[in-house]
Amino acid sequence: MMTTLSLQRPRARRGFLGALAALALATFAAALPGPAAAKEEWRVTSAAQPGLLKDHHVRVTEAIGKGAAGALKTEWQFIASEQEALQQVVRGRLQVAIVSTLGLSSVAPELAVFATPYLWASPAEGDAVIDRHAMNWVGPILDAKGLVLLGFTETGFNDVMSKAPLRTPAEVKGRKIRVSPAPSSQFFWGSLGANGVQLPLGEMFPGLEQGLVEGADLPFVYYITTPAAKSAPNVTLTRHTHLFNGIVANKAAWQKLTAAQQDGIRKALPSHASLRGEVRAAETPLMAKFEADGGKVHRITDAQRKAWYDLVAPGQPAYVEKMGPAAVKLFNDIQAARRAR
């Protein structure tokens, strides 16, 4: 009788070999390149038109993505209304907005103090006070509104632009001038005796083209990107209102990041001082091109500018007082910082 050999392995051995094979397969699979962890999408918004200011805001957007060390995919998008953009961030529909202090005043009215006409005796004074104190002043105010202040970007100084030259306050008096909804705009033009016509930004450009208004005020690097550069080709360098912007994040979205990611983002952002320097350096060649294209830049002297200052500055305390106690405190803190320089 022939003896047959069983080809079946003992059950225990089969189980051991099966487990070993499964382990090897898992190890091999882990070593294979697979899909990267999904990045969270963050949208960064501002109202910047094509030009230097938009370039800055796109750089901020890219820096946020880079600083987060691969955790975020960032994209810049345009929203024409700063108030709308800010509300989108407050509600968490967008993650970051780059908004002027005037725009920020829609959620924290006292921040409009920074746009007070002729708040600073000189650009150098404003730079020093803002660089030393603004983060500490503005950060806690916005934190209470569900926003995290990450830093600042620059827009520049408002100047007067007009269809006909407006080189002195006397030439402004009685003229139909576009006044923005911001109290600072109403205060400035009211102090000069202008016939103010309130228009939102989007309606200002057709208003100038159609003669509804004869002048307005805007930062030069923004102005030249708009239709106003053609319809109101006279610019007087009054330098009356310094405009800068907060980079603000939705607080809940920010708190989802690790401390290392938050720190990386803050360090990756371009400094306000560097962006401010770029804006000011860009003005000279941009003005030269503007003049070559037929525009007129009226470079008034310090003595001529003082005529504007003397009509506006005395009304500052009463203007700020109308904003309420929080604004008065911020204004007083600014004055104390100016004196301490």
Language model features: what each stretch is:
Residues 32-38:
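Sec/Tat signal peptide C-region and signal peptidase I cleavage site
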Residues 18-31:
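Bacterial N-terminal signal peptides
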Residues 18, 38-125, 133-134, 142-341:
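N-terminal secretory/targeting leader peptides
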Residues 4-20:
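Twin-arginine (Tat) signal peptide motif
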Residues 3-4, 302:
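Surface-exposed binding/hinge segments that line
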Residues 4-5, 28, 62:
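N-terminal compositionally biased, intrinsically disordered segments and leader/signal-like regions
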